[in-house]
């Protein structure tokens, strides 16, 4: 039906006969001549319906309204002097229409296409209209390019694309499973996969050597700006590899993906130990586009003459004292800002926010009187303080201090406006703890229980590290992976450390333990969140902007009204009955 997309045309095509299809973006009648902005997925071009050129086209053009679907045939001509629109890619040309056909009409719109002020609920209810603009199309075009680049890179490296089951069994992977009742086996349930983790390990046991999949995954968890109940990840696994081998593949894939998206990134990426990331930046996914590191000052606080500071500083295993210096901050921050800073950290468990200002005549602030000159001199030296600086302090429980000071670091960077939004700072965080302690004192796997520990014979679980690695971009975790356990005895030992007894091991993971018993090769891999990656590349405010039909933050779809009720007959077929609720 069409000869060109709208923005395929330029001044080089003047005099060419074309046939275009699209939607009416806007229309206007100027002195009997009708001008229509025709929009397709690439952009906009101006149609001119002049009765001098075609009475029939002018007559039909007088009937069009916003979002009518048109087919237009005409000739490209240059716009007149002073009529060029520099805001349009096709702003130097227009189409003199000799034939116009209305393919379809449109009802009154619930909102103006492309209006940034429309609420998200109404946008998602009419998602098919919300997507009907070039900005949205460009994001999905970029997503498509990224997927193609990923597949091409992995194919070049010898990986096989293999699809793994969507209907599987429930396994503990950190979040709640979505369950699907079985009609054939009443009372039994499938689970939608949180990841293809176990299946890709089984493919390594099968000798496939190199696997990948752009996989759909499902997690029934509380949602945030960068989370969805169903999401897509680039899933990779390889045999006979080391951590270095896997990281090299990950970097090569990311380099190709970002090149396809218009960015030439430098490899290899920086590396940082998990412990260093936590102690210096307060989290395991630091944003390295700005500085503001945390400095350890617990030994200085241990010598304070105030027990509020000295007592917690005596226990360096459980507590922390951290300082963040802001160069020139004393000349930047107002009293009101300083109050806001304290209000901010209190939201995350801080009891307050101590600070010291560096003046011409020395250090000032409520903390100074609690230290001798020797400690003051050490603070100046360690924090590299200069006149005009301000340094903030956090002291107390290790987990709490690292959390709120890490958050405060990012908050300060935003307040100071020092984050370069066009910068891409990649980082590998390595050597994660194998286990983390829960609020009830029990332990769980930090990544998952199939990760190879570095030192499985260590008695203290908190001292066991794993061969695990995360890739971080601008303070956001893009993905991660690990070298896997490939020996049955080590896997059983890890299960035992997690208080999973032999009966439960056989019940939930018998197929994996069997596979590890028949000559499983050393293997490892990683997964990268494709949705999150595209969100960052396109600078979208939410992951929902780069998913064609996303769920809301309450895991619902306003457009299809999912999740929905089902009939009693459907429930009976599945052997189910809802407590206290009957449906028709």
UniProtKB/Swiss-Prot annotation:
<dbReference type="InterPro" id="IPR004115">
    <property type="entry name" value="GAD-like_sf"/>
</dbReference>
<dbReference type="InterPro" id="IPR029351">
    <property type="entry name" value="GAD_dom"/>
</dbReference>
<dbReference type="Pfam" id="PF00152">
    <property type="entry name" value="tRNA-synt_2"/>
</dbReference>
<dbReference type="InterPro" id="IPR006195">
    <property type="entry name" value="aa-tRNA-synth_II"/>
</dbReference>
<dbReference type="InterPro" id="IPR002312">
    <property type="entry name" value="Asp/Asn-tRNA-synth_IIb"/>
</dbReference>
<keyword id="KW-0547">Nucleotide-binding</keyword>
<dbReference type="GO" id="GO:0005737">
    <property type="term" value="C:cytoplasm"/>
</dbReference>
<dbReference type="InterPro" id="IPR004365">
    <property type="entry name" value="NA-bd_OB_tRNA"/>
</dbReference>
<comment type="similarity">
    <text>Belongs to the class-II aminoacyl-tRNA synthetase family. Type 1 subfamily.</text>
</comment>
<feature type="region of interest" description="Aspartate">
    <location>
        <begin position="197"/>
        <end position="200"/>
    </location>
</feature>
<feature type="binding site">
    <location>
        <begin position="529"/>
        <end position="532"/>
    </location>
    <ligand>
        <name>ATP</name>
    </ligand>
</feature>
<keyword id="KW-0963">Cytoplasm</keyword>
<feature type="binding site">
    <location>
        <position position="173"/>
    </location>
    <ligand>
        <name>L-aspartate</name>
    </ligand>
</feature>
<dbReference type="InterPro" id="IPR012340">
    <property type="entry name" value="NA-bd_OB-fold"/>
</dbReference>
<keyword id="KW-0030">Aminoacyl-tRNA synthetase</keyword>
<keyword id="KW-0648">Protein biosynthesis</keyword>
<dbReference type="GO" id="GO:0003676">
    <property type="term" value="F:nucleic acid binding"/>
</dbReference>
<dbReference type="InterPro" id="IPR004524">
    <property type="entry name" value="Asp-tRNA-ligase_1"/>
</dbReference>
<feature type="binding site">
    <location>
        <position position="477"/>
    </location>
    <ligand>
        <name>ATP</name>
    </ligand>
</feature>
<dbReference type="GO" id="GO:0004815">
    <property type="term" value="F:aspartate-tRNA ligase activity"/>
</dbReference>
<feature type="binding site">
    <location>
        <position position="219"/>
    </location>
    <ligand>
        <name>L-aspartate</name>
    </ligand>
</feature>
<feature type="site" description="Important for tRNA non-discrimination">
    <location>
        <position position="82"/>
    </location>
</feature>
<feature type="site" description="Important for tRNA non-discrimination">
    <location>
        <position position="30"/>
    </location>
</feature>
<feature type="binding site">
    <location>
        <position position="484"/>
    </location>
    <ligand>
        <name>L-aspartate</name>
    </ligand>
</feature>
<dbReference type="GO" id="GO:0006422">
    <property type="term" value="P:aspartyl-tRNA aminoacylation"/>
</dbReference>
<protein>
    <recommendedName>
        <fullName>Aspartate--tRNA(Asp/Asn) ligase</fullName>
        <ecNumber>6.1.1.23</ecNumber>
    </recommendedName>
</protein>
<dbReference type="GO" id="GO:0005524">
    <property type="term" value="F:ATP binding"/>
</dbReference>
<feature type="binding site">
    <location>
        <position position="228"/>
    </location>
    <ligand>
        <name>ATP</name>
    </ligand>
</feature>
<keyword id="KW-0436">Ligase</keyword>
<comment type="subunit">
    <text>Homodimer.</text>
</comment>
<dbReference type="GO" id="GO:0050560">
    <property type="term" value="F:aspartate-tRNA(Asn) ligase activity"/>
</dbReference>
<feature type="binding site">
    <location>
        <position position="447"/>
    </location>
    <ligand>
        <name>L-aspartate</name>
    </ligand>
</feature>
<dbReference type="InterPro" id="IPR047090">
    <property type="entry name" value="AspRS_core"/>
</dbReference>
<dbReference type="Pfam" id="PF02938">
    <property type="entry name" value="GAD"/>
</dbReference>
<feature type="binding site">
    <location>
        <begin position="219"/>
        <end position="221"/>
    </location>
    <ligand>
        <name>ATP</name>
    </ligand>
</feature>
<dbReference type="InterPro" id="IPR047089">
    <property type="entry name" value="Asp-tRNA-ligase_1_N"/>
</dbReference>
<dbReference type="InterPro" id="IPR045864">
    <property type="entry name" value="aa-tRNA-synth_II/BPL/LPL"/>
</dbReference>
<dbReference type="Pfam" id="PF01336">
    <property type="entry name" value="tRNA_anti-codon"/>
</dbReference>
<comment type="function">
    <text>Aspartyl-tRNA synthetase with relaxed tRNA specificity since it is able to aspartylate not only its cognate tRNA(Asp) but also tRNA(Asn). Reaction proceeds in two steps: L-aspartate is first activated by ATP to form Asp-AMP and then transferred to the acceptor end of tRNA(Asp/Asn).</text>
</comment>
<dbReference type="InterPro" id="IPR004364">
    <property type="entry name" value="Aa-tRNA-synt_II"/>
</dbReference>
<keyword id="KW-0067">ATP-binding</keyword>
């Amino acid at each position: 039906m069409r000869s060109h997309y709208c923005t395929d045309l330029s001044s080089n095509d003047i005099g060419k006969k074309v046939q275009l299809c699209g939607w009416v973006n806007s229309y206007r009648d100027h002195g009997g001549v009708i001008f229509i902005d025709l929009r397709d997925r690439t952009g906009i071009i101006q149609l001119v319906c002049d009765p001098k050129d075609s009475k029939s086209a002018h007559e039909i053009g007088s009937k069009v309204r916003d979002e009518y679907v048109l087919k237009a045939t005409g000739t490209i001509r240059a716009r007149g002097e002073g009529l060029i629109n520099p805001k349009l890619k096709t702003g130097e040309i227009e189409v003199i229409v000799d034939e116009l056909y209305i393919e379809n009409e449109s009802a009154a719109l619930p909102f103006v296409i492309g209006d940034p002020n429309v609420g998200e609920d109404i946008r998602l209810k009419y998602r098919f209209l919300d997507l009907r603009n070039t900005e949205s199309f460009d994001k999905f075009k970029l997503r498509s390019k990224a997927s193609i680049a990923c597949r091409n890179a992995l194919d070049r490296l010898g990986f096989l694309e293999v699809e793994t089951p969507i209907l599987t069994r429930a396994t503990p992977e950190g979040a709640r499973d979505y369950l699907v009742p079985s009609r054939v086996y009443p009372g039994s349930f499938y689970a939608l996969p949180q990841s293809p983790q176990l299946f890709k390990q089984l493919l390594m046991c099968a000798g496939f050597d190199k696997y990948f999949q752009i996989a759909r995954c499902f997690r029934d968890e509380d949602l945030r700006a960068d989370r969805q109940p169903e999401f897509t990840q680039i899933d990779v696994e390889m045999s006979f590899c080391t951590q270095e081998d896997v990281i090299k593949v990950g970097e090569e894939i990311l380099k190709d993906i970002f090149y396809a998206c218009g960015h030439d990134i430098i490899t290899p990426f920086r590396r940082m130990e998990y412990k260093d990331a936590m102690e210096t930046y307060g989290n395991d996914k630091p944003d390295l586009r700005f500085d503001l590191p945390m400095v350890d000052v617990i030994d200085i606080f241990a010598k304070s003459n105030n027990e509020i500071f000295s007592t917690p500083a005596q226990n360096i295993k459980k507590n922390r004292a951290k300082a963040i210096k802001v160069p020139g901050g004393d000349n930047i921050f107002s009293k009101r800002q300083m109050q806001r800073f304290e209000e901010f950290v209190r939201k995350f468990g801080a009891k307050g926010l101590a600070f010291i200002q560096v003046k011409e005549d020395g250090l000032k602030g409520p903390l100074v009187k609690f230290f001798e000159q020797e400690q003051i001199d050490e603070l100046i030296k360690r924090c590299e303080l200069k006149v005009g600086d301000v340094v903030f302090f956090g002291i107390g429980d290790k987990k709490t201090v690292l959390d709120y000071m890490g958050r405060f670091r990012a908050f300060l960077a935003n307040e100071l406006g020092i984050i370069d939004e066009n910068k891409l700072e990649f980082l590998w965080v390595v050597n994660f703890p194998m286990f983390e302690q829960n609020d009830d004192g029990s332990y769980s796997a930090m990544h998952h229980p199939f990760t190879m520990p570095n030192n499985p014979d260590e008695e203290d679980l908190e001292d066991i590290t794993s061969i695990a690695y995360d890739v971080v971009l601008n303070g956001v975790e893009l993905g991660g992976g690990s070298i896997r356990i490939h020996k049955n005895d080590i896997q059983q030992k890890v299960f035992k450390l997690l208080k999973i007894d032999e009966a439960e091991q056989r019940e939930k993971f018998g197929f994996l333990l069997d596979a590890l018993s028949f000559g499983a090769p050393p293997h490892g891999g990683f997964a990268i969140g494709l949705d999150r990656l595209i969100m960052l590349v396109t600078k979208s405010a939410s992951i929902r902007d780069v998913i064609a039909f996303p769920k809301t933050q309450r895991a619902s779809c306003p457009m299809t009204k999912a999740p929905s009720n089902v009939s009693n007959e459907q429930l009976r077929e599945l052997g189910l009955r809802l407590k206290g609720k009957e449906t028709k």
